[in-house]
């Protein structure tokens, strides 16, 4: 398998909320805003509903988002993954990304499974905590797609 870069998304979480759960887990909700650059270029907006194991534990991103492409197209995306909590200032994230688009040239992504790798960076400057007490940092996510298309085995004729 060979991968090729598809785009890079840089985003921030201007708002967030969190609920503490039994066993030290946390359920969080983040609003994401940013920019997508690469084969798809445009505005990025989304929501992340990750679950995190303790203050310094791993986390599971669960994103739904939209890219408003500069050419007017709308590309919806779904991203699931796993994040390592170390090192704290550059937490690492990997995952799978699925897209939905209703026009060319993006429609080809509808039956492609993309992989992503990225990092969550600690803010370079002091930022005020949001209403939940969390510091809102910056994330950098690169998505890659396989050169060959992948079709779901469960798709019925």
Where do the PLM segments sit?
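N-terminal polybasic/positive-inside topogenic patches
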Residues: 155-157
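Beta-strand-enriched cores of mature, soluble protein domains
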Residues: 1-150
